[in-house]
Amino acid sequence: EKMALLLGHEEDVSHWTNLVRRDPEHVRLMFDQRWEANGHKDFFMGPKNGMLMTNAFWSMRSKYFPREYAEKMINAWAFNREDGFYGEFFPLAMARQSMSKFTSPPDLAFGYTPDTAYFTLDGMFRQGFAKTASELTLNHLENYNYHKEWDLPVAPEAYRRDLALFGDQYSNFNAGKILLFLEGFAGISYSLPNQTLSVREAMPSAWDWMEFEIPIIKKNGRTKIRVERQNKNGGLNKRIIVENCPFKVKLDFWTEEKKIVSSNSNLYETKSSRPHSIAFESSGISSKPSLTVFLK
């Protein structure tokens, strides 16, 4: 419907409205009917044959996916080293409980895969689980995309279940993980039609800072986004700074599940889109919007 309107095909709107039900009750029903399907507890859309794969987590990328289901599935399966998807690192392509049954050559070859990891982790960021998503993303990148013996970055097509490298060692299937930095850790999104920039940061707690420069409008040059954290006065001082942004700005700040002692910003406070966060936005274009928060 939105695409039809944007492209000027208003007559298509009624076509899609009649073809696909979009009322909230029906959308929720579609998720409820697939939750714990075929007896798989705290799992989404599990198949009859018992082959539990990460595509259950991919569904969390939908803005309609129930957050309470996402939380249950993450707690039950993401950190589960016995039956779930946490192997030598996160995520296994197939749940451990399914591995004894599915042992074909492809099953053994694709023990850990890059694109499935991206879809899985992206869903966690989108659902607002900043702590879990950032920790598991670091775990994946450090183990999948860095070879300790060679002391080099790598981008393999897959790791076998026994952790041997498989396939192309320069695989573009890894390219999606760039978005785990841009859209995950930094939470950057912008709209040219609405002229807005949003930063919903989830910087790993192990990092002191991160900085991004992104092209938005060519004539303006790059927009710089920086997040800093510093232990100070028995607490944590955290800051977001945006420079050279041609749009209105919204900053959604992750409190790392700590108590907010004070905040200082040249923006206006607004509603945050996730738990353990505080958000501010500008009423217009600001030369250097920023947000500083002291946490304990």
List each language-model region with its residue ranges:
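Well-ordered alpha-helical scaffold segments within catalytic/enzyme domains
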Residues: 1-10, 57-69, 118-130, 180-189
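Extended, compositionally biased low-complexity polar/Lys-Gly-rich tracts
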Residues: 3, 42-43, 236-238
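Extended, well-ordered alpha-helical scaffold segments
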Residues: 3-29, 67-82, 128-143, 193-202
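Short amphipathic alpha-helical segments at helix-loop
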Residues: 5-8, 105, 162
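Residues at structural and domain junctions
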Residues: 13, 45, 106, 119-120, ...
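Extended glycan-interaction surfaces of carbohydrate-active proteins
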Residues: 18-112, 145-159, 220
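Non-catalytic C-terminal accessory modules of carbohydrate-active enzymes
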Residues: 119, 123-296
